Regions:
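Short, polar loop motifs at secondary-structure junctions
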Residues: 98-105
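Active-site metal-binding motif and surrounding structural segment of the metallo-beta-lactamase
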Residues: 55-97
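Accessory terminal helices/loops
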Residues: 6-18, 179-289
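A short glycine-rich beta-strand->turn/loop micro-motif centered on a GG-aromatic cluster
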Residues: 1-7, 100
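Generic structural signal for helix capping and beta-alpha/helix-loop junctions
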Residues: 8, 79, 105-106, 204
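Active-site loop signature of alpha/beta-hydrolase-fold enzymes
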Residues: 6, 104, 158
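Catalytic core of the metallo-beta-lactamase
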Residues: 15-70, 107-196, 280-288
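Short beta->alpha linker loops
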Residues: 3-4, 53, 77, 199
Length: 289
């Protein structure tokens, strides 16, 4: 591979998830990390969700697909990779959004997601499920488009649920995750396509290279999402989450909170390694997103 590991870590592969005359959705796959970001495009306007630190990828995408980046969003405070959100928003003059729960105590310049029920992108309304969808981190947020596409951040993966223990409160956050699964997301239709922020296995891609799955299939294949007994669910999730944390996650979180600045070499070092942001479960292949 020309450029070796460095080039591989910076390689992003965009795939069109959906396109009609009103809406285009692109999934941008950072293969070395299993990180997924998204462009939601309508009428020449765009929203970028969960961008990686290589912001030129999104600038090139905007040029290629002829849209102006108006909104940049992080679904949560990432623990496994460095966000490009604030830098991208600053460079293009877009609004940067983050949950106020996630941004608490930081000096980030942001618009609180929890102030918005919807964000308009061209002719499309992006519904902000700042329900919020906690459980992974307390301010995790999901985004629903046309009741057909759920951009789930790290709350629901193709093969697992978000890890609730990265804040050291596994049991409390597992209870939040229970509420998310069985109340906040309960009424979403089975044919809603879940598009997560991570994946860990190439089997999670479909034949077009898109990582995503119908919510009904995830419910069907994911035993833990059918366990409506709160005590049992909480114990199972909290227990499954007691595993190794993402490498360097405290330093990465500090960078994403705007408390620490590092050079590119250190940033690359910090991001090397697998993602560990999902709960292991039974009923489908293991997830380590």
């Amino acid at each position: 591979l020309a450029g070796g590991m460095l080039a591989w870590s910076r390689f992003y592969h965009p795939v069109i998830v959906y396109a009609d005359e009103k809406l285009k959705m692109i999934q941008i796959n950072r293969l070395a990390k299993g990180c997924l970001s998204y462009a939601v495009i309508s009428e020449g306007k765009g929203m970028i969700i969960d961008p990686g630190k290589e912001i030129e990828v999104y600038l090139e995408l905007a040029g290629e697909h002829r849209f102006e980046i108006e909104h940049v969003v992080d679904s949560h405070l990432h623990a496994d990779h460095i966000t490009g959100g604030p830098r991208l928003a600053e460079q293009v003059g877009a609004t940067y959004y983050l949950s106020s729960e996630e941004a608490k105590g930081t000096h980030l310049k942001y618009e609180p997601l929890d102030r918005h029920d919807r964000i308009k992108v061209g002719d499309v309304q992006v519904e902000v499920l700042s329900i919020p969808t906690p459980g992974h981190t307390p301010g995790s947020t999901s985004f629903l488009i046309d009741n057909r596409f759920l951009l789930s951040g790290d709350t629901i993966f193709v093969g697992g649920l978000g890890r609730p223990d990265l804040g050291g409160k596994a049991k409390e956050w597992a209870e939040d995750l229970y509420h998310t699964v069985f109340f906040k997301l309960k009424d979403l239709p089975d044919d809603c396509l879940v598009l997560p922020a991570h994946y860990s296995d190439i089997r999670e891609m479909n034949d077009r290279g898109v990582v995503g799955e119908l919510l009904g299939k995830i419910r069907e294949n994911n035993e833990i999402m059918r366990n409506e007994d709160k005590a049992s669910f909480t114990e199972q999730v909290a227990g499954a989450a007691s595993m190794e944390k993402p490498p360097n996650f405290e330093e990465i979180v500090a960078i994403n909170r705007g408390e620490l600045q590092v050079d590119e070499e250190r940033a690359i070092e910090l991001e090397i390694g697998p993602n560990r942001c999902a709960v292991h479960h039974h009923g489908s292949h293991e997830e380590e997103a």
